[in-house]
Amino acid sequence: MAEGIKDKVAIIGMGCSKFGERWDARPEDLITEAFEEALNDAKIEKESIDAAWFGVFYDEQNVGKSAYPLSQYLRLPNIPVTRVENLCATGTEALRGAVYAVAAGACDIALAVGCEKLKDTGFAGLPERTKGTFEDLYQPGFTPPGAFAQLGAAYAHK
């Protein structure tokens, strides 16, 4: 039977960039702002970080398809960095990867970072239904936020 991880992992710090229309800030500025706050909150040096997970969904509007920008922006060389995406749950997916790595004993301190910056890129929202969206994979009218809302409601009902 699976064993829980609640006694194996602790979140020791967190940071968040200032919310709002940040026209002057690039994605790497937002990432760095949140990272520095997290380091201060955790009272650790960045050299203590053993691995990182980087959540970004709309890569073309943000930082590209690779996880490399995270280690470049934060000056975190020589640690593994994994890029993840999972629609609206991408940030949670990054956190999940970091938590599982610590719980498994693969590292002592892991970093989870999520970043999206869409409004100043010309991005208008989910793609039109005629441009190869989820319509053929799921029921008509499916959108990721709607599906997550239904899953949340079903979970709360149980």
Give the positions of each predicted feature.
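Short, high-confidence coil segments that cap the C-terminus of an alpha-helix
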Residues: 106-110
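Conserved "HGTGT" condensation-loop signature of ketosynthase/thiolase-family condensing enzymes
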Residues: 1-81, 103-104, 114-158
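A short, structured active-site edge motif that brings together acidic residues
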Residues: 80-88
